[in-house]
Amino acid sequence: MHECMKAKKIIDVACYPTLSDATAGGVEEGAVTLNLCRSHIDESILVDEAEIKEAMLFTINQHHMLIEGAAGVAIAAFLKEQESYKGKRVAILICGGNIGIEKLRQVIS
């Protein structure tokens, strides 16, 4: 989505293995999500696999919640930029606990 928003149109992007299956891949032609995102998103924060894994482990250890990779992306983005949110109220939408045992093994190994 990030690359499509930069291009202001749907483009093909490379797809790589990730802990965040729900955010993998590109945007389908004709999808309404690009226009919605362009209307409502001011900024995006990119995170890598190590940051997603760290966020998932943080959530397991600190909050005793098992989350999937897509929720880990949101938490990783916050952790990456947390200094800029000091003194502010922040809400992070954590949706999804749909993680298979193999992905969980990758996270905790």
Language-model regions: role of each:
Residues 1-39, 85-109:
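Glycine-rich phosphate/pyrophosphate-binding loop at beta-loop-alpha junctions
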Residues 30-87:
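Active-site-adjacent helical/loop segments in soluble small-molecule enzymes
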